[in-house]
């Protein structure tokens, strides 16, 4: 669904774990990392699109997550001119996104990047909460900064455990 301004309706998904970390995924066959996201189909609500994309991109079902919050409004970013497909009608100049913050209730092993048969991602990892703002492709950075700021209090308040630290071996002399 592309609106009259040329923005495609899209949902963004931030999945957090009990350590206050967020899931960060690498685009299939590329070196770029991002949060899961995807388009909203005609007749589909943003929440329905989020659950569909959640399964298609990372193999998680509603029973694996809890919705903690969503953005108050749609956030927009423009695509760089080199990525705008001028031959498509209507022309899509960017995305308008409704973002969802989810808490993972299941084990990490429930994450399956190949669940749809057409993987969007080929790797994933847990990263510190603010890490994606610095690492995402530049044209998405402002939206990432806004959504992470809006979700920060909620996301970090659901941190229930400290990240396990690697034990440092102590040498004994003698």
Swiss-Prot record:
Accelerates the degradation of transcripts by removing pyrophosphate from the 5'-end of triphosphorylated RNA, leading to a more labile monophosphorylated state that can stimulate subsequent ribonuclease cleavage. Transmembrane segments: none annotated. GO terms for cellular component: cytoplasm. GO terms for molecular function: mRNA 5'-diphosphatase activity. HAMAP family: Nudix_RppH (MF_00298). InterPro entries: Nudix_hydrolase, NUDIX_hydrolase-like_dom_sf, NUDIX_hydrolase_CS, NUDIX_hydrolase_dom, RppH. NCBIfam families: PRK00714.1-1, PRK00714.1-4, PRK00714.1-5. GO terms for biological process: mRNA catabolic process. PROSITE patterns: NUDIX, NUDIX_BOX. A motif (Nudix box) lies at residues 38-59. This is RNA pyrophosphohydrolase. Belongs to the Nudix hydrolase family. RppH subfamily. Its cofactor is a divalent metal cation. Keywords: Hydrolase. Residues 6-149 form the Nudix hydrolase domain. Its EC number is 3.6.1.-.
């Amino acid at each position: 669904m592309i609106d009259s301004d040329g923005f495609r309706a899209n949902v963004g998904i931030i999945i957090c774990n009990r350590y206050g970390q967020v899931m960060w995924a690498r685009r299939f066959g590329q070196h770029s990392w991002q949060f899961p996201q995807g388009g909203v189909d005609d007749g589909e609500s943003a929440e329905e699109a989020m659950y569909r994309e959640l399964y298609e991109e990372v193999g998680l079902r509603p029973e694996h997550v809890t919705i903690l919050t969503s953005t108050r409004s749609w956030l927009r970013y423009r695509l760089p001119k080199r990525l705008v497909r001028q031959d498509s009608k209507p022309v899509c100049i960017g995305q308008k996104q409704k973002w969802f913050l989810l808490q993972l209730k299941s084990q990490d092993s429930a994450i399956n990047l190949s669940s749809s048969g057409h993987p969007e991602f080929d790797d994933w990892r847990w990263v510190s909460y603010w890490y994606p703002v610095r690492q995402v492709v530049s044209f998405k950075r402002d939206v990432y900064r806004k959504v992470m700021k809006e979700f920060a209090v909620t996301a970090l308040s659901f941190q229930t455990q400290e990240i396990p630290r690697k034990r440092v071996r102590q040498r004994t002399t003698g």
